[in-house]
């Protein structure tokens, strides 16, 4: 297919999605929840087909020499699929984000202004591997009244085709037009999707650093996402050693390919001699490769030396860099210089240190005495997430339903005109909030 043919075909798909989304936006909460329940049931019924498609994807990816972190994201086992379907049902239980009155204000007698939440329109989701992301995103899109065009990586095509097939079958029995969900599978379609600013309202990329940056640099459509997942745990001088070990190990090994896994461990110099040998042993038992700065090597001479590159590297693997710092101030400076504004944690029993850390670390998530792996829409109670944003502007952090809506102003009058409120005898506004 030529570039022109791809563009023409994708324009048609985008128009169909937008039309279907406009009808979805008008449906009742009950109708949307029924559709979400039907999607969950259809996915359960297609479980074997989806899992087999993923096995086929994994085998093909292995033959092509896929990178280890990407392979881990690609794998969809029965446990992951079950959790994803449970997440769909959880979205059905969430409050409807559409039609919420944010402002209701009388400007004058009979002249009332409202600000009401409404869908964004059509979402363009581009992701590498991680087929369960498609399930999460589809459920959130339906609940928030948005159409969604999914573009999966070539390594996950079979899995995503099986998922979207099941979703469309489920929607076909409901009031939601199945055309509200679309799937693209080729690189050429990715480039054309990024040009569809007439039909697509938001692009959400999920993948590697280079991939997200490519998307950000090649579209005029607003992009929500993050390009890096360089997270830290700082072990303060007042840390409880056992808590520090447990959190450090969990934040690194529970799922090292996740963007909320830590890449650097910062340790206060006054606690380093006691803490580092213990945490090193715990991490070694989980086969984590350690790298350390000069002072760390004096305590752990058997590990590799860290370089400046390590502080800005997202390993997404069983590798962890360690640096000893002289103070909380130095730890915060390191995080703000090398971190990705994703999620960073402090382990301490010092309340004042927590307040300083929370106030000065410029990340979407700042945690105290708990693992960075909690930075997740499902764990936050959002039902699921479409992605994580490290941007300064909202939405920020794990993005659930609230990040997929915008608002419009509705005003109702009785023949009111602006001339009444201007000039020498201008009538004053009442500006009374209901």
Swiss-Prot record:
Decide whether keyword Cytoplasm is in the record.
yes
Keyword list, A-Z: Amino-acid biosynthesis, Cytoplasm, NADP, Oxidoreductase, Proline biosynthesis
Q: Give the CC-aspect GO terms.
A: cytoplasm
Q: Per its UniProt record, what Pfam families does this chain match?
A: Aldedh
Where does the record place it? Cytoplasm
The family database entries (PROSITE patterns) matched by this protein are listed as: PROA (PS01223)
Q: What is its EC number?
A: 1.2.1.41
**Any GO molecular function:** glutamate-5-semialdehyde dehydrogenase activity
Question: Which reaction is recorded as catalysed by this protein?
Answer: L-glutamate 5-semialdehyde + phosphate + NADP(+) = L-glutamyl 5-phosphate + NADPH + H(+)
- Presence of keyword rRNA-binding: no
For this chain's UniProt record, which GO biological process terms are given?
Answer: L-proline biosynthetic process
Q: Tell me the route in metabolism or biology where this protein functions.
A: Amino-acid biosynthesis; L-proline biosynthesis; L-glutamate 5-semialdehyde from L-glutamate: step 2/2
Question: For this UniProt entry, what is the primary localization, expressed as one broad class?
Answer: cytoplasm
Q: Which family does it belong to?
A: Belongs to the gamma-glutamyl phosphate reductase family.
Q: What function does this protein fulfil?
A: Catalyzes the NADPH-dependent reduction of L-glutamate 5-phosphate into L-glutamate 5-semialdehyde and phosphate. The product spontaneously undergoes cyclization to form 1-pyrroline-5-carboxylate.
Q: What is this protein called?
A: Gamma-glutamyl phosphate reductase
């Amino acid at each position: 297919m030529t570039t022109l043919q791809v563009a023409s075909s994708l324009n048609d798909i985008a128009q169909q999605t937008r039309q279907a989304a406009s009808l979805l936006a008008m449906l009742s909460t009950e109708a949307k929840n029924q559709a979400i329940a039907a999607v969950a049931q259809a996915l359960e019924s297609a479980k074997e087909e989806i899992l087999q498609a993923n096995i086929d994807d994994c085998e093909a990816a292995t033959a092509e020499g896929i990178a280890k972190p990407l392979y881990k994201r690609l794998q969809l086992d029965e446990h992951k699929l079950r959790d994803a379907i449970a997440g769909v049902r959880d979205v059905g239980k969430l409050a409807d984000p559409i039609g919420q009155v944010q402002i209701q204000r009388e400007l004058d007698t009979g002249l009332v202004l409202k600000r009401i939440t409404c869908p964004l329109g059509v979402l363009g989701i581009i992701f590498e591997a991680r087929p369960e992301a498609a399930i999460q995103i589809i459920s959130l899109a339906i609940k928030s009244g948005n159409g969604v065009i999914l573009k999966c990586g070539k390594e996950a095509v079979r899995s995503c085709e099986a998922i979207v097939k099941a979703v469309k079958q489920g929607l076909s029995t409901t009031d939601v037009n199945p055309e509200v969900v679309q799937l693209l599978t080729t690189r050429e379609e990715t480039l054309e999707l990024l040009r569809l600013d007439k039909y697509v309202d938001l692009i959400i990329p999920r993948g590697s650093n280079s991939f997200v940056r490519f998307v950000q640099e090649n579209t005029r459509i607003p992009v929500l996402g993050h390009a890096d997942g360089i997270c830290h745990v700082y072990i303060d001088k007042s840390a409880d050693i056992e808590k520090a070990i447990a959190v450090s190990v969990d934040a690194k090994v529970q799922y090292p390919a996740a963007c909320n896994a830590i890449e650097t461990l910062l340790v206060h110099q006054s606690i380093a001699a006691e803490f580092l040998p213990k945490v090193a042993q715990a991490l070694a038992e989980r086969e984590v490769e350690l790298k350390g700065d000069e002072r760390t090597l004096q305590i752990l001479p058997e590990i590799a030396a860290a370089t400046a590159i390590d502080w800005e590297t997202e390993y997404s693997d069983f590798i962890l860099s360690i640096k000893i710092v002289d103070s909380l101030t130095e730890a915060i400076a390191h995080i703000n210089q090398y971190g990705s504004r994703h999620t960073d944690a402090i382990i301490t029993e010092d309340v004042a240190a927590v307040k300083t850390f929370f106030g000065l670390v410029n990340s979407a998530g700042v945690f105290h005495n708990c693992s960075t792996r909690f930075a997740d829409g499902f764990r936050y109670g959002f039902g699921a997430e479409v992605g994580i944003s490290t941007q300064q502007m909202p939405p920020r952090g794990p993005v659930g339903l609230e990040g997929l809506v915008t608002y419009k102003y509705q005003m109702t009058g009785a023949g009111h005109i602006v001339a009444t409120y201007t000039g020498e005898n201008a009538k004053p506004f009442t500006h009374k909030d209901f």
